[in-house]
């Protein structure tokens, strides 16, 4: 899920480091070993070097981005354009629950509030669009005359017979389809098909909107002109034996496995054995708690023997692949909707070292639902090893060459569901860095079922879920993402972390061992808080200190009854700790690394607004990206989207939809060259401003029509049937039919 955090206070000045669009640096790079955090007393003024602002204090308005006066276009208010040509003045920041696919039921006064609508039907037009769109639709993208599948991949005179004959509802006349049944070819990407460029063929054939780049008209031996599809034999040979959806993509679920899961013909033997073992021990555990003065060693040996009866050589957490987190491994948060494969691929290009899938629900996975399994797909760039410079704590046995970047995040509300989900994932997804259990999602739809943040109030249950996941996950490590707690001013994360690292009393007494998690990620907000306040990095720092103390405490438990079984401790007993919340610059990143003492920082909204934050972290400087460079990232996303979802009308529509989802965040970026002071704050909202050129101004627009214009630069004009509803109702868009 998305989310990031606020700065740790300090009296030391922040090093100034700003680069122009060509990456020319001014100032010093922050060092992970020599912390130089930011200060409210001394700030860096852009356009100059290391200016001490104590001599020339400038009042900074809370919640408002400090844009240079000459760039401000209107008074200091935020304006949202609407299709009725009215403007709604916005004085509060947009709720960023859109990054977590939040529903609107927690909001008062949203579209479900009938106070305004009770006056009658005629009042509907005056009703403001607020809150979240919970049941969104996106129209349809299809050809005017759908082409029959027997013709799609065949040359004009070589198509097989359609078994439906004249009764077929689809078009068989190829020339008629090309002339009347589809829109004209796109001229973007130099008119070259992005799929053909990689594969040497296009699996969409005549349906491709770039078909002119891989087709031609040839004369036959009978003097007729035939339309034929071209192929590049050399490039095509590189992917021989692969299905169309397996080119440059891993973790593809075979059709027969998906069919078997949906028909319940594929079992989960490891989970069944583990659950049977747990259930068989319930009576003995009760006896243990009734008489806890018994022979602990004898009971331990008895349980080991019983475990061997039910589970055949299970993988213990300590036998799993080792993980590593360090200053050189910034993490991209699991982002619902926005965290799709093309976007993750773009972030990896820009320096992201660890990626996570969108949160997948457990039940659809074990039922073989195609949409949920699609979330497990990863691009081949995500299975490369993350950067490794041995700057952090390296556990014994860590093999960077065997490590990859991509992990899967799941949500589950019961031990049996989590166990079975992990088992089918590890059996069918060979490229997973780790599997993360989401205990931070605050949305009602998830929490009402007992998943997400709801697990924070059930610590023993959560521990049991994670322990079971470890038993069935083979060599794949298990991690967990949590929040501070469920309620404001009542954080519970420290208590939970202690249980997860050391093990709860009942688990240790019954010899179940610790949870075995290899890493814990903490989002510095509560479930109730959402994004109304900045993330609490001081609390994250306290939790990081706690984990360091717990390591010493575990060492002190040697030869005691409370000692955890070393076989149940992942990463040789070292639990990595990752902070999450409001990271928006390399200064934020290194501040958190140095002052909160986390092993790494997970970045969500900051990466949505400016994906090159990973590049800034690597180079240790601000990068003042030009509008042209930012447009190139949009072009790259569009290209990756077409390679993922297809270059036909349907694939272009899907790519456009997810591009607009990203632009609903990316338009918030304020170029650092327009700011009076650094570092920028992700919670600050800018007044309406003029960019340094028309393109930069366009890219900062909150108007949904301008997002459409940007998409049309690379995906062509949106069809009349296209409809876009962003998660914020104020930005909803439905294209008007021409004429």
Curated annotation (Swiss-Prot):
What positions constitute the catalytic site? 441
Question: Where along the chain is composition biased (Basic residues)?
Answer: 121-130
Basic and acidic residues bias: start-end ranges:
102-116
Q: Where is the composition biased (Low complexity)?
A: 8-37
UniProt-recorded Gene Ontology molecular function terms: flavin adenine dinucleotide binding; mRNA dihydrouridine synthase activity; tRNA dihydrouridine synthase activity; tRNA-dihydrouridine47 synthase activity; zinc ion binding
In this UniProt entry, which cysteines form S-S bonds?
A: none
Q: Which InterPro entries match?
A: Aldolase_TIM (IPR013785), DUS-like_FMN-bd (IPR035587), tRNA_hU_synthase_CS (IPR018517), Znf_CCCH (IPR000571)
The subcellular localization recorded is: Cytoplasm; Nucleus
Which positions in this protein are listed as binding FMN?
A: 334-336, 409, 481, 523, 580-582, 604-605
Give the record's keywords alphabetically: Cytoplasm, Flavoprotein, FMN, Metal-binding, mRNA processing, NAD, NADP, Nucleus, Oxidoreductase, Repeat, tRNA processing, Zinc, Zinc-finger
Q: Which cofactors does it use?
A: FMN
For biological process, the GO terms are: mRNA processing
General function of this protein: Catalyzes the synthesis of dihydrouridine, a modified base found in the D-loop of most tRNAs. Specifically modifies U47 in cytoplasmic tRNAs. Catalyzes the synthesis of dihydrouridine in some mRNAs, thereby affecting their translation.
Please identify the protein, giving its name as recorded.
Answer: tRNA-dihydrouridine(47) synthase [NAD(P)(+)]
Please name the taxonomic classification of the source: Eukaryota, Fungi, Dikarya, Ascomycota, Pezizomycotina
């Amino acid at each position: 899920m998305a989310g990031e955090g606020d700065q740790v206070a300090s009296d030391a000045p922040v090093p100034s480091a700003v680069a122009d669009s060509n990456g020319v640096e001014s100032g010093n790079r922050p060092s992970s070993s020599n912390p130089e955090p930011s200060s409210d007393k001394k700030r860096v003024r852009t356009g100059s070097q290391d200016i001490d602002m104590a001599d020339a204090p400038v009042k900074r308005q809370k919640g408002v981005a400090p844009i240079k006066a000459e760039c401000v276009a209107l008074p200091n208010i935020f304006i949202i354009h609407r299709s009725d040509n009215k403007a709604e003045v916005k004085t509060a920041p947009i709720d960023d629950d859109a990054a977590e696919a939040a529903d609107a039921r927690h909001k008062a006064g949203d579209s479900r509030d009938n106070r305004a609508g009770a006056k009658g039907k005629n009042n509907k037009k005056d009703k403001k669009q607020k809150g979240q769109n919970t049941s969104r639709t996106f129209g349809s993208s299809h050809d005017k005359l759908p082409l029959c599948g027997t013709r799609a991949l065949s040359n004009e005179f070589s198509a097989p017979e359609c078994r439906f004959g004249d009764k077929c509802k689809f078009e068989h006349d190829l020339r008629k389809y090309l002339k009347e049944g589809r829109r004209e070819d796109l001229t973007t990407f130099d008119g070259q098909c992005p799929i053909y460029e990689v594969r040497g063929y296009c699996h969409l054939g005549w349906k491709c909107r770039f078909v002119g780049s891989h087709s031609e008209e040839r004369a036959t031996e009978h003097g007729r002109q035939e339309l034929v599809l071209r192929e590049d034999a050399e490039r095509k040979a590189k992917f021989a034996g692969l299905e169309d959806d397996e080119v440059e993509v891993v973790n593809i679920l075979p059709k027969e496995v998906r069919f078997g899961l949906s028909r319940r013909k594929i079992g989960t033997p490891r989970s069944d054995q583990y659950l049977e073992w747990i259930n068989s021990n319930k009576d003995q555990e009760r006896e243990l708690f009734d008489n806890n003065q018994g022979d602990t060693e004898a009971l331990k040996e008895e349980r080991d023997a019983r475990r061997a009866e039910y589970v055949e050589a299970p993988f213990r957490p300590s036998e799993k692949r080792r993980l590593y987190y360090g200053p050189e491994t910034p993490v991209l948060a699991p982002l619902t909707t926005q965290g799709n494969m093309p976007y993750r691929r773009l972030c990896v290009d820009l320096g992201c070292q660890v990626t996570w899938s969108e949160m997948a629900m457990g039940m659809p996975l074990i039922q073989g639902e195609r949409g949920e399994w699609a979330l497990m797909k990863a691009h081949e760039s995500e299975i490369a090893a993350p950067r490794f410079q041995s700057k952090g704590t390296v556990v014994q046995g860590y093999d960077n060459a065997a490590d990859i970047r991509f992990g899967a995040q799941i949500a589950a509300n019961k031990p049996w569901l989590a166990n079975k989900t992990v088992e089918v994932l590890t059996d069918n997804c060979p490229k997973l860095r780790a599997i993360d259990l989401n205990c931070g999602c605050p949305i009602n739809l998830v929490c009402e079922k007992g998943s997400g943040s709801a697990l924070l109030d059930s610590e023993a249950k959560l521990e049991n879920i994670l322990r079971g996941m470890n038993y069935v996950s083979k060599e794949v490590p298990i991690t967990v993402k949590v929040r501070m707690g469920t309620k404001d001013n009542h954080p519970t994360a420290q208590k939970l972390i202690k249980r997860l690292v050391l093990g709860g009393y009942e688990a240790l007494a019954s010899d179940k061992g610790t949870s075995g998690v290899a890493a814990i990620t903490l989002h510095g907000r509560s479930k109730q808080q959402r994004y109304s306040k900045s993330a609490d990095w001081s609390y994250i720092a306290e939790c990081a200190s706690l984990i360091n103390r717990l390591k010493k405490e575990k060492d002190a438990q040697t030869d005691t009854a409370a000692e955890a079984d070393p076989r149940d401790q992942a990463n040789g007993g070292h639990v990595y700790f990752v902070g999450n919340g409001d990271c928006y610059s390399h200064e934020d990143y290194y501040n958190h690394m140095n002052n909160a003492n986390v092993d790494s920082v997970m970045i969500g909204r900051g990466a949505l607004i400016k994906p090159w934050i990973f590049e800034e972290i690597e180079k240790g400087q601000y990068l003042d990206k030009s509008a042209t460079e930012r447009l190139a990232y949009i072009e790259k996303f569009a290209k990756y989207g077409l390679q993922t979802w297809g270059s036909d009308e349907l694939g272009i529509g899907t790519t456009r939809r997810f591009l607009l989802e990203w632009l609903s965040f990316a338009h918030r970026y304020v170029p650092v060259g327009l700011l009076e002071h650094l570092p920028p704050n992700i919670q600050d909202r800018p007044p309406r401003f003029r960019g340094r050129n028309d393109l930069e101004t366009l890219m900062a627009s909150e108007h949904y029509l301008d997002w459409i214009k940007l998409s049309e630069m690379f995906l062509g004009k949106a069809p009349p049937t296209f409809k876009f509803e962003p998660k914020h109702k104020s930005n909803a868009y439905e294209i008007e039919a021409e004429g």
